[in-house]
Amino acid sequence: MSIDNIISDLLEKVQCEEGAFPYMVNKREFIPGESPVYYSGPYWDNNEIEVIFKSFLKGKWLASGEEVNKFERKFSKKFGKASSLMVNSGSSANLVMIAALKKKFGWQDGDEIIVSCVGFPTTIAPIVQNGLKPVFVDINFTDLNWDVDEVEEKISTKTRGVFSSPVLGNPYDFDAILDICERYKIQLISDNCDSLGS
């Protein structure tokens, strides 16, 4: 039996057991006012399942191999960049990014990065893991993003950057934050896991 036939059989078996694709792992009956609203989670269709099966069955690595290289090239082209580095999660991406920026700009342990007080721990953890100090800024209650006025108030001689992470994909006042960063000659760092391409 060929690998393609094995993949076809596996796809058919998964569809029989789980239902037609696309498939959401947290798929449950939704009851308004009672059920939680899942805004993320594993979601895939036949294309992703087929690539996963081929990668496993043909002995290719998922972590860094042919499929990841293809994706990195397409991703770079879409966003007009020379290259991209894919990692296993947004948490790892933030950790790699902060470590690279610290080295590139010569940041010292104890230097400060301004972050929103509302967001994910994956924005704050890499700051701490790299020996930097998070400085928290309050939010506005319209879109749950920065109180822009407070960002400028929190800047000190040790501030090296502002780490943005749009809450639930809600855009923040990018122009105002960029203006502040440019005036104080600090870096604007973006975690776009929830707003990629927006």
Spans of model-derived segments:
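N-terminal "arm"/small-domain region of PLP-dependent enzymes with the aminotransferase-like
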Residues: 1-62
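PLP-dependent aminotransferase-like
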Residues: 19-21, 103-183, 187-192
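Conserved donor sugar-nucleotide recognition element shared by glycan-biosynthetic enzymes
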Residues: 64, 68, 90-94, 119-120, ...
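Phosphate-binding glycine-rich loop
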Residues: 66-112, 126-130, 136
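Acidic/histidine-rich catalytic cores of soluble enzymes
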Residues: 195
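Active-site "gating" loop of Rossmann-like NAD(P)-dependent oxidoreductase/epimerase domains
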Residues: 198
